UniProtKB/Swiss-Prot annotation:
It comes from African swine fever virus (isolate Warthog/Namibia/Wart80/1980) (ASFV). The keyword Lyase does not apply. The keyword DNA repair applies. GO terms for molecular function: ATP binding; DNA ligase (ATP) activity. Its EC number is 6.5.1.1. This is DNA ligase.
Length: 419
């Protein structure tokens, strides 16, 4: 239960993250709220059991620390909590649990006062997946098992509360969603009960609706209020190193604060011991009508997708699609070891072109092909041939196959014999 609150314990005192601001003279000021448990005039360790059972003769104390850069620390008077609330009811709290709830409420209130409004340049791009249909072995070498979640084929969205109390909902590319009032209304209610500095990372989705329809609704100024927001992660801008398993614990606690939400949901988590268990879950999710599965490294930090960075702490599992496309040209890779390695260029019926990586050719073969294949040889032997292409999905914007890899030609052709 202690892990459900932002912050950490040091010397038996739990401190929430500092809320920082700037003084009129330009110095950095920090405000911190803390909770300690005292029994017989001694500060004792805070345990999870204290959130469900009171400790005899123990009281909880809340206090704040305030200091300005290069200045002394000022500590407030103690606020003592001697009993819980709603005693005898389902939602009863112990002394310690009530103290933490009171401290969180004060923390949020102070954060609202000090937190500046977001601007578009202040949006944090969400974490992106690096691995496709590969789960690194390191995921299973951690003390905590990796987490598997359903992968919905929806539109990525991140939510946060601005300094004026309004809700900002933005896309993977940091574009604000102007509609979705049904979701924003519930987010505003939810932020009354949780840390206002938290970002909620998820997907806009409606089960069994095509991605094109979902994207149209998400980007409309006036939508049909049918989309739901499925939250699969959360993060704090000043605590990006927080491991994934703790973020998931905090996310669970967030949703416990308000359980009557209709359009906002926490994505279900499944712990797995090995790759086979993850693959079985992927197959189950696909049968249920979902796109596949996401695997999260339990100890992985939150790594924002700045400059299209893809995090090595995420893996996506989903079935591959394949189709035949007309080969119209060839080119080479642009950087690293792909520079000088041949790539095929295919064309869609609407004349849009896309690049395809040969799947079964070694780099040595690809280098040799690009070096020796002439336009004349290409036109004579390969131009206009049907190429079988394996891909992850079609781009909802362009219809172009994504992560395209050439499996082979429809008619038997050994491209290495051409040169």
């Amino acid at each position: 239960m202690l892990n459900h609150f932002p912050g950490h314990c040091s010397n038996n005192i739990f401190c929430f993250p500092p809320i920082e601001s700037e003084t009129k003279s330009g110095k950095k000021a920090s405000w911190i709220i803390c909770v300690q448990v005292v029994q017989h005039n001694t500060i004792i360790p805070i345990t999870d059991e204290m959130f469900s059972t009171d400790v005899k003769d123990a009281v909880a104390e809340i206090f704040t620390k305030f200091f300005v850069e290069e200045g002394t620390v000022r500590i407030s008077k103690m606020t003592r909590v001697t009993e819980g609330k709603n005693l005898g009811k389902k939602n009863a709290t112990t002394v310690v649990h009530q103290a933490f709830k009171d401290a969180l409420s004060k923390y949020n209130r102070h954060a609202r006062q000090k937190r500046g409004a977001h601007t578009n340049t202040g949006m944090i791009p969400p974490m992106l997946v690096k691995y496709f249909n590969i789960i690194p072995k390191t995921f299973f070498e951690e003390e905590t098992d990796p987490i598997v979640q359903r992968k919905r084929n929806g539109v990525r969205a991140v939510a946060c509360q601005q300094g004026d109390g309004s809700i900002l909902l933005y896309s993977r590319t940091e574009k604000e969603f102007l509609g979705l009032d049904n979701i924003k209304k519930e987010l505003k209610q939810l932020y009354l009960f949780i840390d206002v500095r938290v970002y909620l990372d998820g997907e806009l989705y409606l089960h069994r609706k095509p991605l094109q329809w979902i994207a149209g609704q998400a980007n409309a100024k006036t939508d049909s209020s049918e989309l739901h927001f499925y939250v699969f992660d959360c993060f704090w801008s000043d605590q990006l190193q927080m491991p994934s398993n703790k973020r998931q614990q905090l996310l669970t606690n967030i949703f416990k604060q308000k359980e009557d939400l209709t359009f906002i949901h926490q994505v279900e988590n499944f712990s797995v011991k090995n790759e086979d268990e993850a693959l079985r879950l992927k197959a189950q999710f696909i049968k249920e009508g979902y796109e596949g599965a996401i695997v999260r490294n339990a100890n992985g930090p939150y790594e924002p997708g700045y400059n299209n960075y893809h995090s090595a702490h995420l893996a996506k599992l989903k079935p591959l699609l394949d189709a035949e496309f007309i080969l119209v040209d060839y080119t080479q890779g642009k950087k690293g070891k792909d520079l000088g390695a041949i790539l095929w260029v295919c064309e869609l019926p609407n004349k849009k072109r896309f690049v395809v990586t040969p799947k079964h050719l070694t780099y040595a073969d690809r280098y040799a092909l690009f070096q020796k294949l002439t336009p004349a040889l290409f036109k004579k032997h390969l131009y206009g041939k049907e190429l079988t292409v394996e891909y992850a999905e079609l781009s909802p914007k362009t219809g172009i196959p994504l992560q395209a890899r050439a499996v082979g030609f429809r008619e038997p052709i050994n491209v290495l014999e051409i040169i």
